[in-house]
């Protein structure tokens, strides 16, 4: 398998630390709201990676954390007169429901930050003892100047960090780029149950130490792959890498770093202030199916930017319709035990997760099905298509379910009358019946064998 490693800025042959247990850590959601489509693209991308690794290796340990303590969570809890656990329980449940409807597999473990406070405290104490962290007014900061390699992941140097970067400016820092490991509790924290005792007073962790603690707790000092969105490369992942390498001087933390590209909406950055903030829940409730959302994410290479717009949605719907239409040879669910996922699909994914090429292979399969004259061969091709598409997380419906086909006798009668009109050469009547059905929201598709597929648009 070849993957692009952000750390080396090059494609590399993937060589796991242990071929019997590949370890991967991915930054999951901060649960203060429903998951937006930018977050969800990342989840789908690493779901594909998880599926691929499970084919290539006997065991994969996939950790996707949940950030359940954060300023945004506290703000929501305060505004709704709730504690943080009430807020996070609601949105964790919603997140898992929504990702399920995108056909994402569950990770091996899904740790929560609040369940790993003791590990964070131990890491912070190590950083202080090793001279990589310091205390100012009950706040613990990481000293970036104590780590000469700081900036190697994002390609920034320390001087660049002073100007124009996303850095919290805190009084008492030795350097503007120093970041918080532990902060003292406020009265609001005490009220909302968002603080814990520590050697430096009651408080709560900084964001970056959370992922270092959870990855260490579940994967150890070193692991194979760290994934996340491009927006996390700096400062979050840079800070993770620094503090983990400093806490464990003989480690390198993650061997490979993978980052998926940005997502825009109508060529603009997604923002609540712009009114273009889209959640998966909104899209699902509006009638856009989970498979359509997933298909859109897979149609663009994970490292490239993706623009979400109405044309993209329509195109994905039409493409899936074409694939599903190829399944209408049989009314029964096909048993897939005697076929395997196409080698072409696996090869595409082994090449830096080239999902657009894998999608193209699915459409080539559809063409093969439509051209097949032998029914047994056609059914075999359909089974391979379904097995391969299922591996990508799509085509989990029958064609009847997808097109919402039912047994409306009036519609069937009109289709029969249209067929008779065509047989008798009365094409005007046949076209008129087609239009009548179209006005009722019924779309017809004539097959070469003389049968007609219909579905509700």
Swiss-Prot record:
Xref: CDD domains: CysRS_core
Subcellular location(s) per record: Cytoplasm
EC code(s) of this entry: 6.1.1.16
Major localization listed first in the record, in broad terms: cytoplasm
Motif residue range(s): 'HIGH' region: 29-39
Keyword S-adenosyl-L-methionine among record annotations: no
Gene Ontology molecular function, alphabetical: ATP binding; cysteine-tRNA ligase activity; zinc ion binding
GO cellular component: cytosol
Motif window: 'KMSKS' region: 269-273
Catalysed conversion reaction: tRNA(Cys) + L-cysteine + ATP = L-cysteinyl-tRNA(Cys) + AMP + diphosphate
Note describing how the cofactor binds: Binds 1 zinc ion per subunit.
Annotated binding of Zn(2+), by residue: 27, 211, 236, 240
InterPro entries: Cys-tRNA-ligase, Cys-tRNA-synt_Ia_DALR, Cys-tRNA/MSH_ligase, Rossmann-like_a/b/a_fold, tRNA-synt_1_cat_dom, tRNAsynth_Ia_anticodon-bd
GO biological process, one term: cysteinyl-tRNA aminoacylation
Cofactors named for this entry: Zn(2+)
Keyword field: Aminoacyl-tRNA synthetase, ATP-binding, Cytoplasm, Ligase, Metal-binding, Nucleotide-binding, Protein biosynthesis, Zinc
Residues that coordinate or bind ATP: 272
Subunit structure: Monomer.
Family: Belongs to the class-I aminoacyl-tRNA synthetase family.
Identification of the protein by name: Cysteine--tRNA ligase
